[in-house]
From Swiss-Prot:
It is a single-pass type II membrane protein. One of its GO terms (biological process) is heart contraction. The chain crosses the membrane at residues 38-58. Residues 59-291 are extracellular. This is Gamma-sarcoglycan. It is found in: Cell membrane, Sarcolemma; Cytoplasm, Cytoskeleton. It comes from Bos taurus (Bovine). Disulfide bonds join C265-C290, C267-C283. InterPro entries: Sarcoglycan (IPR006875), Sarcoglycan_gamma/delta/zeta (IPR039972). Disulfide bonds are present. One of its GO terms (cellular component) is cytoplasm. It comes from the Eukaryota.
């Protein structure tokens, strides 16, 4: 309680103080005072709860001066230990694992990595899905550890840079268009087979085609004609024995006259046929085979 007294005093004048003095009460009393104390108490409780929750979050999330939990902030970037889940897109410049461990990217649906230009357009994409791996780019390359290109794909060609391309499928390799290669050979215990089931098979080389079987034989089977044609050279059959077992055979002459010998006759169109050998040529006797 504060009492204020207002008295005017004039020099040389004596005034007696009144018996009834005015008293003014300044402050908060009653239920307002109790509500104020209650509000301050609640505010203090909320402050303590917030402080306790802050301490608990710091302990649970493993906050430290260098980062949060397994996530450490270093001069080179962010260092993350253990497994992490990203619920939204992740934009980074470089991702690499520790020296003693591998890098694993895993998702229940698919893993998609995009490369964008300065305008935000996708210039390259790698998508690993549950059924296929999809690559979208102008060129796809696989290099060896020393930087040698092993496999290159673009819109115009597919290039294999290895010393050997091996196809192990039971159906072999299927090519819808032409193939350029300096050498085609099978595994040592297997046979080499070139087949075109419904169309023709063509082999072209400006400096020649060499077919060699050092330890076996070469067979050419066809239902129609086999044509050996040389425009400026010679067709050479270089062997100790040349057999033509299915040549047309003329009629047999008198018994004992030929002694089992035949002569090879040539028609004007190049057709060959056999005629029983005699004292002289007998080709004209069987010239009807040329008709």
């Amino acid at each position: 309680m504060v009492r204020e007294q207002y008295t005017t005093i004039t020099e040389g004048t004596h005034i007696e103080r009144p018996e009834n003095q005015a008293v003014y009460k300044i402050g908060i009393y009653g239920w307002r005072k109790r509500c104020l104390y209650l509000f301050v108490l609640l505010l203090l409780i909320v402050l303590l709860v917030n402080f306790a929750l802050t301490i608990w979050i710091l302990r649970v999330m493993w906050f430290s001066p260098v980062g949060m939990g397994h996530l450490h902030v270093t001069a080179d970037g962010l260092h993350l230990e253990g497994e992490s889940e990203f619920l939204f897109p992740l934009y980074v410049k470089e991702i690499r694992s520790r020296v003693d461990s591998s890098l694993l990217l895993q998702s229940t649906q698919n893993v998609t990595m995009n490369a964008r230009n300065t305008e935000g357009e996708v210039t390259g994409r790698l998508k690993v899905g549950p059924q296929m791996v999809e690559v979208q780019s102008q060129q796809f390359q696989i290099h060896s550890k020393d930087g040698k290109p092993l496999f290159t794909v673009d819109e115009e060609k597919v290039m294999v840079g290895t010393d050997k391309l091996r196809v192990t499928g039971p159906e072999g390799a299927l090519f819808e268009h032409s193939v350029e290669t300096p050498l085609v050979r099978p595994d040592p215990p297997q046979d080499l087979r070139l087949e075109s089931p419904t169309r023709s098979l063509s082999m072209d080389a400006p400096k020649g085609i060499h077919i060699q079987a050092p330890a076996g034989k070469i067979e050419a089977l066809t239902q129609m004609d086999i044509v050996l044609q040389s425009s400026d050279g010679t067709v050479v059959l270089d062997a100790e024995t040349v057999c033509l077992p299915e040549l047309a055979l003329g009629s047999q002459g008198p018994a004992g006259s030929s002694q089992g010998l035949y002569e090879v006759c040539v028609c004007p169109d190049g057709k060959l046929y056999l005629s029983v050998a005699g004292m002289g040529t007998t080709c004209h006797e069987h010239s009807h085979l040329c008709l």
